Amino acid sequence: VRNNVMPHLTISAIEARNVDVLIPAFEKVCREKLQPLDEKGVVNVNNAINIVSIGQLFPRVIYAAPVLNEYMMNLSISIYNEFTTIPETNISKFYQPYSWMPHITLGKCLDKEQMRQAFAVLQNLFMPIDGQIAKIGLSTVNPYREVLSVEL
């Protein structure tokens, strides 16, 4: 874990002059989309994730790839729709709905030999993983800092 950044799945990448302008939109998405109640008033979130493959973003990133499911796509759309209305913000073209590839970075800034070694290890050890998305967070990068998060 480099720079205290835990393994994570990035849903969106948003440039903003100040992270504080993003907090109300983040809270709204969390309140309206992440905690839906069923008819009995029970939280009903299908936050399953199935990590099925290993891949590479050339030239220096190796990642684990989850299957893009309805939950992740709906979350991506909700975040885009909510955050795109905030003045002086820009959402990366690589994280907009239908142009987003979910991935969990396992290593970055790898040279060719490190990449070969990583694939050799994972070829022997990787098995598909069924899990749950446990938390949604709003963070800054360079340096990394978690601003706000919601446990699911």
Please tell me what each predicted stretch does.
Residues 1-152:
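Histidine-dependent nucleotide/RNA phosphoesterase domain, centered on the 2H-phosphoesterase fold
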